[in-house]
Amino acid sequence: MRIHRALFVLLVWTGTLTFVEASHAQAPAAAKAAGAGKASKAGVPTLKPEVHANLGQLMKGILYPNSNVIFAAQDQNPADVKPAQDPSTAVNPLASSYGKWEAVENSAMALVEAANLLILPGRKCANGLPVPIQNPDWPKLVQGLREAGLTAYKAAQSKNQDNILMAADTMTTACANCHDKYREKPNLADRCK
């Protein structure tokens, strides 16, 4: 019995030492990984915005699909959309786990937040030209998108399709104002000029 107890104590002691050593060995690696960005005074890494997508990718990946959710709510009452067989994997936001009017609200807020992505320095248009954030009209056009998104959000909160019709009209105007100037060019190389 004494041998079993001694063996047990030895195993616990060895396990504790191993755990402590492993913890100390991982601490510098974790600290180094956490410090990938510059650390602030509080020791928290600071992050800077990074631009990875071009303007076309941003439009196709965020603005276009979220605008379509709002446009879809003009014709079909989101409250009447049946959930998908598996809402967690639904490709239609209106039939997803966060569907119905909530999907319209979320899409509107995605447009509002995406406006911030349109003013980040360093983004390129699909043709390689810089996004014209320095042009005097660009901030107004981006603000028009932001306001259209907020209008759509309020309309979605009201759960009223007449309000969505008006919000969609505001959104169409905001999109057209920018597209008419910077996108609708016969030659791709002339976009963003």
Language-model regions: role of each:
Residues M171-Y182:
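The canonical Cys-X-X-Cys-His
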Residues A27-T170, E184-K193:
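Extracytoplasmic c-type cytochrome modules immediately beyond a signal peptide or single-pass transmembrane anchor
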Residues V20-A25:
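Boundary at the C-terminal end of the N-terminal hydrophobic targeting segment
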Residues M1-R5:
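Positively charged n-region of N-terminal signal peptides that target proteins for export
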Residues L7-T18:
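Bacterial N-terminal signal peptides
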